[in-house]
Amino acid sequence: MSSEEAKVVVPRNFRLLEELERGEKGIGDGTVSYGMDDADDIYMQSWTGTILGPPNTAYEGKIFQLKLFCGKEYPESPPTVRFQTRINMACVNPETGVVEPSLFPMLTNWRREYTMEDILVKLKKEMMTSHNRKLAQPPEGNEEARADPKGPAKCCVM
């Protein structure tokens, strides 16, 4: 039996539980983190991530919040990744905050063994590249989270 045939494919939910456990323990130097967005999400689809802006870049001193959505095909297919915090970066749609797969090779060339941690670390490295590191960022007063794409929440006051 070759090593290819012996490779075990870990089911989606077990894989996500492994990622959750790793995210809760903390990652590397602490400049990226992630976890479940909603503890009641039994399908483990909605995740939140954080990247601390790297030093000596236009992102320094800022905390960037992201949403990652792992559809039913994850980890065979990549999650969708969207910055909640406004950011000016070559691979990010400035209107929606979506990380464009066509501009972020890791998503275009997705492999099953990649993780959400890998995405966050790669985005942080992307912030440090020559074409991103000096990009002017949105003004300070503009750090509020992006509006929910589902529209405003409706509320009643009685």
UniProtKB/Swiss-Prot annotation:
User: Which Pfam families did the record assign?
Assistant: UQ_con
Q: What Gene Ontology biological process does one annotation of this record name?
A: positive regulation of protein polyubiquitination
Which GO terms of the cellular component aspect does the record hold? UBC13-MMS2 complex
Q: Where is this region: Disordered?
A: 130-158
- Give the domain of life: Eukaryota
Q: How does it assemble?
A: Heterodimer with UBC35 or UBC36.
UniProt-recorded name of the protein = Ubiquitin-conjugating enzyme E2 variant 1A
